[in-house]
Amino acid sequence: MAHTKVAIIGSGPAGYSAAVYTARALLAPTVFTGPESGGQLMYTTEVENFAGFAEGIQGPELMFAMRAQSERFGAVMRDELVTAVDFSQRPFKIWTELPDGTPYELYKMGKPEELHEVMTTLRKTEPQWTADAVVLSTGASSIMLGVPGEKELLSKGVSTCAVCDAAFFKEKTVFVVGGGDSAMEDATALSKFAKSVTILHRRDSFKASKIMQERVLANPKIKVLWNTQVLEILGAEKVEKIKINENGVEKELPAEGVFMAIGHKPTTQVFADQVQLDGHDYLVTRQSATKIGLDAAQAALTEEGLIAYPTMTSVEGVFAAGDNVDVRYKQAITAAGQGCSAALDVERWLERQ
């Protein structure tokens, strides 16, 4: 069993920024990046809205640079999946192994009850790590359809971030899958660049807010196909067609881009019974933009009227940053800022222990 003063669970902009700041504070953080380090930006081609890169930067390149920067200051990277935690007492316990015969896929597609059973089994064994403080920066992942061609053509015309990639689809034919606010926002953003935007929605009405629906339906560049399901995304090296079922009729349509906008799911299942989550499985901190977060903030006010350790979760010594907390913005640069904030909170909290 090994010990680290600060454990950062998850990589991406939030985790790597937290690593840079805690490492510079001489806290020698250990970053558990998981086997797929770098987060959602590893699937993003050009990043043009991250301040400091006048010509833009490739998503993977940005993540590699942030990782190298944190390592330069002394952060230790562990490309391991955190399989269970115990935050009931300090030092906190962290497991990075799976019971014999348990597949890694359980942590990506397994049922909550199955995952809970595995974690309960692990907590009866000796952990691989302990930590004095923990930063949770596991992010969130876009919910995907699971249709053929989707995974193979990701970053080759299939995207989960219209804000990030819209400019690369200038004068192209694109489709947006979804019917909520995210789909409306994506379609509107894409309409500024694309030749045509078609929203594919499986129902006969949107669930988005009325004002966002009105904007979309009034936009001459946006078309809606109701009662439509995506069956397959076709293409060799890039998206070429999309196969759909519209009102019971199957057809193939030419396509150059397909944007998934059916929601995001925070990666918090490993912490579900250890820290407080909101109704949508996002981690609750003292600065969360939710009623639960406001209540937590009110209870943590200092004599000066400030929130003590805004990034702290419901467990003292456990902090959170990035898209597993952020219910609103979900941008790389805001995640990086939250990672910085969490690191500073960790440093100040440890000084007082």
Spans of model-derived segments:
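Beta1-alpha1 glycine-rich phosphate/pyrophosphate-binding loop at the start
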Residues: T4-F73, G178, S182-K210, L225, ...
